[in-house]
């Protein structure tokens, strides 16, 4: 949805992109690698990988990274907070990119905030696929991945000297498309939508974020 908004130029020249993944878990979850402190554990390697990858897909690799990574929960062995700034991305060097997550975000925050010279877009809530899967709903179910209209993001633009606030339809998500692409790549030679070089790039950015935070 964000990519579509940008491709249509609905906000004019984009100047700021903020992606936040709010979580609230003020205790240490037992029996999970995410809380053990082993390599690959912690919030930055877990959720950080997703928000970094999304930003890179939209704006390209940055020239530099500035980050603050911390452990805020009592007795936590892993990082549970990060704020990462990606500086001068290759596709849009002037865009200010901020990526943020924490396990101590009890109040809701927007998932995406975009500001351009001609408007803004603010989106709360998450892709509904994970919740549906947890409830036992299968991806073959009609209207899979479609978001309720009440969860659509809001476009804030100026029309005729007035600020107008309009819901913008969320495009349906489709986790299965990733695996279908791998199948078609193996069986039919179709190009991968996400190759190993991109994965390595995201890992390097996470490592750079850690280096910046030390």
Name each model feature, range by range.
Residues 1-75:
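Predominantly a Rossmann-like dinucleotide-binding segment in NAD(P)-dependent oxidoreductases
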Residues 18-19, 66-67, 98-101, 115:
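Short beta-strand segments
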Residues 49, 74, 100-108:
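Glycine-rich phosphate/pyrophosphate-binding beta-alpha loops
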Residues 76-81:
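A short, glycine/Asx- and small/polar-enriched loop/turn
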Residues 84-94, 114-117:
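Active-site beta-strand termini and strand-to-loop segments that position acidic
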Residues 113-193, 197:
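C-terminal glycine/acidic-rich active-site capping loop/insertion
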Residues 205-214:
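Short arginine-rich
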């Amino acid at each position: 949805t964000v990519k579509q908004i940008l491709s249509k130029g609905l906000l004019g020249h984009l100047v700021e992109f903020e992606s936040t993944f709010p979580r609230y878990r003020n205790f240490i979850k037992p029996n999970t690698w995410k809380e053990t402190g082993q390599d690959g554990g912690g919030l930055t390697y877990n959720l950080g990988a997703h928000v970094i990858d999304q930003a890179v897909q939209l704006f390209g690799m940055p020239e530099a990274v500035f980050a603050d990574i911390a452990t805020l929960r009592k007795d936590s062995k892993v990082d549970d907070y990060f704020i990462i700034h990606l500086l001068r991305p290759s596709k849009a060097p002037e865009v200010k990119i901020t990526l943020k997550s924490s396990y101590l975000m009890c109040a809701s925050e927007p998932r995406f905030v975009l500001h351009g010279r001609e408007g803004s877009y603010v989106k709360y809530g998450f892709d509904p696929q994970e919740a549906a899967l947890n409830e036992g709903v299968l991806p073959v179910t009609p209207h899979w991945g479609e978001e309720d209209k009440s969860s659509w993001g809001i476009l804030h633009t100026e029309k005729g000297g007035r600020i107008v606030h309009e819901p913008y339809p969320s495009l349906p998500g489709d986790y299965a498309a990733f695996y279908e692409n791998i199948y078609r790549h193996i069986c039919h030679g179709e190009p991968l939508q996400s190759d190993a070089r991109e994965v390595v790039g995201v890992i390097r950015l996470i490592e750079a974020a850690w280096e910046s935070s030390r």
